[in-house]
A protein has these predicted regions:
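Short beta-strand/loop motif that positions the catalytic acidic residue
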Residues: 197-198, 204-206, 210
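Active-site loop/oxyanion-hole signature of alpha/beta-hydrolase fold enzymes
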Residues: 55-96, 246-251, 255
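Acidic catalytic loop of the alpha/beta-hydrolase fold
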Residues: 209-213, 243
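Active-site glycine-rich loops that stabilize anionic/oxyanionic intermediates
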Residues: 33-36, 99, 125
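Conserved HGGG/HGGXW glycine-rich cap/lid loop of the alpha/beta-hydrolase fold
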Residues: 18-64
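Conserved alpha/beta-hydrolase catalytic His-Asp/Glu region
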Residues: 147-200
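Flexible "cap/lid" loop of the alpha/beta hydrolase fold
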Residues: 106-110, 116-150
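Catalytic active-site module of serine/aspartate enzymes centered on a nucleophile-bearing elbow/loop
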Residues: 230-272
Length: 272
């Protein structure tokens, strides 16, 4: 497989794009999750090589891409990817985002760029849980305990906060290193308004056993999008977890995406 990787720089930030495929007029862009890189989506991306020009991207701070500037959020990531799309790609684009990459995809699709043909969100967070839900109550309890430990630091000592971080910090948080402040900002973002602004066709793909981004998020995204004019479809994959595209899941996900793209292309052709 012939591949070409190149850097794209804008505003002091850099992404790395690896391109391959046979069709110069149909582009599909893959955006990876937090703590991952373009290799994480290579298995599913290569399956689109016969039908699309494939773009595998390392977002700033991941893979071969250097750290982003201080103070970044998903808005800044979307700005960078948008600049890349406008400068490097001519023709309709399908965006496929997993987890964190899905957050960036939501931000981009909400801008209604004419070149974005459709989006695929895979196991994407970004919507707040109900305060009275199990996850909402747990989050409130964890934050309240941390606030109390900070107030009583003179009595409990610094070890109490360190214990709290080890006990309740996510794997991503514990491994984030210099990206930790960015991660905190990202996980506290609410993409509700952005989801409501999306008008292009959207496929939501989730694993029924996903504990990182539980299925209620998929149904909430579906509700938000379809109540505001989006042609959104949900495909819940039985017994799949957060990494629904891994292993044999790559072929299953690619099959589902291809089938969905054929349907929306037929609908659009009929509308013309």
């Amino acid at each position: 497989m012939q591949t070409q990787a190149q850097r794209f720089e804008r505003g002091g930030a850099t992404l790395v794009d690896e391109m391959f495929g046979s069709r110069a007029d149909r582009h599909i862009v893959f955006l990876h999750g937090w703590g991952a890189n373009r290799d994480s989506l290579r298995g599913i991306a290569t399956l689109f090589q016969p039908t699309h020009h494939v773009h595998l991207i390392d977002l700033p701070g991941f893979g071969a891409a250097p750290l982003p500037p201080d103070g970044w959020s998903t808005i800044d990531y979307a700005d960078l990817v948008q600049a890349y799309l406008l400068e490097r790609i001519s023709g309709p684009v399908i965006l496929v985002g997993h987890s964190f990459g899905g957050r960036v995809t939501v931000r981009l699709a909400a801008r209604r760029l004419p070149g974005i043909h459709a989006i695929v969100l895979m196991a994407t967070p970004g919507l707040p849980a109900s305060p009275l839900s199990k996850s909402g109550l747990r989050r409130w309890g964890i934050r309240t305990l941390r606030a109390l430990l900070k107030l009583t630091r003179g009595l409990t000592g610094p070890g109490a906060l360190a214990w709290h971080t080890r006990r309740f910090g996510s794997k991503d948080y514990l491994a984030a290193g210099p990206m930790r402040d960015l991660l905190v900002r990202v996980v506290n973002e609410d993409l509700t308004a952005s989801a409501q602004d999306i008008t292009c066709p959207a496929l939501l793909m989730w694993g029924s056993d996903d504990r990182d981004t539980p299925p209620w998020l998929a149904y909430r995204y579906l509700e938000l999008m379809n109540s505001h004019g989006t042609r959104a479809t949900l495909d819940m994959l039985p017994h799949k977890d957060h990494f629904l595209y891994s292993g044999t899941g790559a072929h299953l996900c690619a099959f589902k995406i291809r089938g969905w793209l054929n349907v929306i292309d037929a609908v659009m052709d009929h509308a013309r």
